[in-house]
Every structure is written in structure tokens, then in C-alpha cells.
Amino acid sequence: MRIEPIIQGVVARSAHPFGCEAAIKKQIAFVKNAPQISQGPKRVLILGASSGFGLAARIALTFGGAQADTIGVSFERGPSEKGTGSAGWYNNVFFKREAEKEGRIAINIVGDAFASETRTQVIEAIETYFEGEVDLVIYSLATGMRPISNQPGEFWRSVIKPFGQTVTGASFDLEHDRWIDTTLESATEEEALHTIKVMGGEDWESWIDTLINAESIAQGCQTIAFSYVGPEITHPIYLDGTLGRAKIDLHQTSHSLNLKLANFDGAAYATVCKALVTKASVFIPALSPYLLALYRVMKDEKCHEGCIEQMQRLFATKLYGQDHISVDGERLVRMDDWELAPHIQNKVNQILEEMDANNFQVIGDYQGFKNEFLQLNGFGFDEVDYSQDIDLQTILKLTP
């Protein structure tokens, strides 16, 4: 069978196994040749390890100098007679294969990170493979809903909406390469609460509490979670909306976790990352034109970073091997420093003032945006022969 990219709006319905393998190998090659992580963690738990920042962090810590062993938790779908499965499934498979080639432990736990059974599996894996303790916990779950405790079948569901105003902005239909104007109504307080429950810090704190109670926290253990703030032009839909409320809750959680981990001479940080094309970010209306302009400017200025560049720089220059960890006035680790540089933002704003439905593919980096989206699912790599037939039985044997 031949696997073609199937896109519906901004959702990819297919994944190419060997394109995902190419993506893993490309990221490994980058971190091996980048400035290396020194004094890094050796036993790392990643919650949300199969794509985006979670996967990039796992690759950076394993191959970028720290030589870490990892346990990765993710909720992915394997191949079947009905479909190819998810990209994250293959990312898990090929990451593990490459890590084990270099003698590293790479445990994949495929399950619901909100479920108590998954936590039990994680604790058992830490006991079995990590001598009972972890040195770093990365919280990188990206999901639209979370089960409500003690209410089977009921969920909190996040929404992407502004507050106190309607916001009109553009998103892209990647299937047909179209600009779509979207108007978002103001969120209700209940919608805000649900979004905080799904995307705020409560589950992160619950995981750390579970690990503390299981005596799985090593001396000096740190934990990080990822956030976004963005420039003022993105604030109506992001920082001042439901997503922003959830991220502020995440930031506050980092402070309470920092106090808890102080008992282990450890620390907790919310890490503010750069705006990037991820499976999650393409769903945010009004952010897409900004991404097109930002990609164009940062590539022109030769300071563009993807997830893997961000994570290698985070661990090599911010979190490890330093006399002290550099944070801002709110105790946030800022990986959006290059993005928010005034000369970058001035040029981005100039492009956005001119961008519309007729010229977005010309003045913005639409091809870069779309290709990065395709590469999340294993497509768009020159070294992969996409005309080659793939035997279903072969990929059914690929297990993480």
C-alpha cells in the first residue's frame, strides 16, 4: 500500500512510518552536532513524549550530551487494517530503536496519562529501570479534554476563546491552501474553568505529588512544563483568553511545586517557548498569520528554531551546566527571547499589516508552515521515497 498525506482542514489523517523515522534521525543528527548538554539529568520521565516539545526534549536529553535514560508516556494509536496509526506511535518506535542502539534505556508507556493505571505503570517502570527515582520530570501533555475524577464518562473540555470581546482572525485550511476568516465569541466563566482544568497546572501538580508519595523523586530533581506568552498582537486570542488563563494557572503551579521540590534540593519551572507549528498550535485561530510572518522573519535573520533547536538550547544553556538558572521577574524560563526581540517583532508587524487572503502565500512563509505541518506526520522529507509501497504486515510489527 502507498501512504499519502491526508489532511482535513488542519487535521492530518495519515502518517508515514518511515517519514517519522527520518524525522527522528534528523533531530538526533542536529543535537549530536549542537553545543552539548553538560551535567544533565540521567533518569528522565516525559509525560507527553511522542511529539512536539516532549519528543524533542527526549531526543535532546538522550543524544545531545546528557546521555539520559527515559520513560515516555503518550496516548497513541497503532496501525491496523483500518489505518496507518498516528505519527506519535512511530515516533515512539523509532526513538526507542535509535536510543537502544547507543545503549540507552527507552521505555514507552502507551496509555492515558490521566488514568491511575498509567501512574501505577510509571511508578513500576521507575522502580524497575531507574532504581526507583527520577532526576527530571517533563510535563508536555497536549489534549483537548480531561476526565473528571469520580465521574466516569464525564470530561472537562478546553476551548480556545477570547474574554470580554469577540475576536476575528485568520486560520488556514491546509487541505485547500485557503485563508479563512474566523470570528470567536467571548468565553463564559465555565468555559474558562474547563480550559484551566485541562491545560492548567492541576494535573502536573498531581503527577508530582504521586511521585513524591511513591518516593520516586531523586535528590536535586527538577520538573518543567511548557507555556507560551507571545507578543501583544497575539494577546487577544492567547494570553488574554482562555488559553492564557490556563497558562497563568500553570505558572502559579510551578511556584507551588518549586516549594515542594525544595525539600529535595530540586526546583520547578514553567518554560515559555517560541511560537511553533505543532499539532496543537494549528488549531488556534488568529495565531497562524503570526506564525507565517514570524517564520519568514526569523529564517531571514537566521535565528529560526524548531522544537528540537529550542529543547537543545534549553537544556544546554538554561537548565543545566550553569551556575544559576536564568529566569524573569515571574520566575519563568524564557525560550521566547529570540522571538520577542524588538527588531524581530517590528519586522513581523510590518508583514502582518500587509498580509491578507490574496498574498499570505507570498509574503509569509506559508510553504515552510505547511511543510513543517506535513513533517509532523512523516511527510515532506526529501530522503524518503513516498512512491514506495509499504507492506501492512511490516508496519503492524512495529511496536513501541
From Swiss-Prot:
<feature type="binding site">
    <location>
        <begin position="112"/>
        <end position="113"/>
    </location>
    <ligand>
        <name>NAD(+)</name>
    </ligand>
</feature>
<comment type="similarity">
    <text>Belongs to the TER reductase family.</text>
</comment>
<dbReference type="InterPro" id="IPR024906">
    <property type="entry name" value="Eno_Rdtase_FAD-bd_dom"/>
</dbReference>
<dbReference type="GO" id="GO:0051287">
    <property type="term" value="F:NAD binding"/>
</dbReference>
<protein>
    <recommendedName>
        <fullName>Enoyl-[acyl-carrier-protein] reductase [NADH] 2</fullName>
        <ecNumber>1.3.1.9</ecNumber>
    </recommendedName>
</protein>
<dbReference type="InterPro" id="IPR036291">
    <property type="entry name" value="NAD(P)-bd_dom_sf"/>
</dbReference>
<dbReference type="InterPro" id="IPR024910">
    <property type="entry name" value="Enoyl-CoA_Rdtase_cat_dom"/>
</dbReference>
<keyword id="KW-0560">Oxidoreductase</keyword>
<keyword id="KW-0444">Lipid biosynthesis</keyword>
<feature type="binding site">
    <location>
        <begin position="141"/>
        <end position="142"/>
    </location>
    <ligand>
        <name>NAD(+)</name>
    </ligand>
</feature>
<dbReference type="Pfam" id="PF12242">
    <property type="entry name" value="Eno-Rase_NADH_b"/>
</dbReference>
<comment type="subunit">
    <text>Monomer.</text>
</comment>
<dbReference type="Pfam" id="PF07055">
    <property type="entry name" value="Eno-Rase_FAD_bd"/>
</dbReference>
<comment type="pathway">
    <text>Lipid metabolism; fatty acid biosynthesis.</text>
</comment>
<feature type="site" description="Plays an important role in discriminating NADH against NADPH">
    <location>
        <position position="76"/>
    </location>
</feature>
<keyword id="KW-0443">Lipid metabolism</keyword>
<dbReference type="GO" id="GO:0050343">
    <property type="term" value="F:trans-2-enoyl-CoA reductase (NADH) activity"/>
</dbReference>
<keyword id="KW-0276">Fatty acid metabolism</keyword>
<feature type="binding site">
    <location>
        <position position="228"/>
    </location>
    <ligand>
        <name>substrate</name>
    </ligand>
</feature>
<keyword id="KW-0275">Fatty acid biosynthesis</keyword>
<dbReference type="InterPro" id="IPR050048">
    <property type="entry name" value="FabV-like_NADH_b"/>
</dbReference>
<dbReference type="GO" id="GO:0004318">
    <property type="term" value="F:enoyl-[acyl-carrier-protein] reductase (NADH) activity"/>
</dbReference>
<dbReference type="Pfam" id="PF12241">
    <property type="entry name" value="Enoyl_reductase"/>
</dbReference>
<feature type="binding site">
    <location>
        <position position="247"/>
    </location>
    <ligand>
        <name>NAD(+)</name>
    </ligand>
</feature>
<feature type="binding site">
    <location>
        <begin position="276"/>
        <end position="278"/>
    </location>
    <ligand>
        <name>NAD(+)</name>
    </ligand>
</feature>
<feature type="binding site">
    <location>
        <begin position="75"/>
        <end position="76"/>
    </location>
    <ligand>
        <name>NAD(+)</name>
    </ligand>
</feature>
<comment type="function">
    <text>Involved in the final reduction of the elongation cycle of fatty acid synthesis (FAS II). Catalyzes the reduction of a carbon-carbon double bond in an enoyl moiety that is covalently linked to an acyl carrier protein (ACP).</text>
</comment>
<feature type="active site" description="Proton donor">
    <location>
        <position position="238"/>
    </location>
</feature>
<dbReference type="GO" id="GO:0006633">
    <property type="term" value="P:fatty acid biosynthetic process"/>
</dbReference>
<keyword id="KW-0520">NAD</keyword>
<feature type="binding site">
    <location>
        <begin position="48"/>
        <end position="53"/>
    </location>
    <ligand>
        <name>NAD(+)</name>
    </ligand>
</feature>
<dbReference type="InterPro" id="IPR010758">
    <property type="entry name" value="Trans-2-enoyl-CoA_reductase"/>
</dbReference>
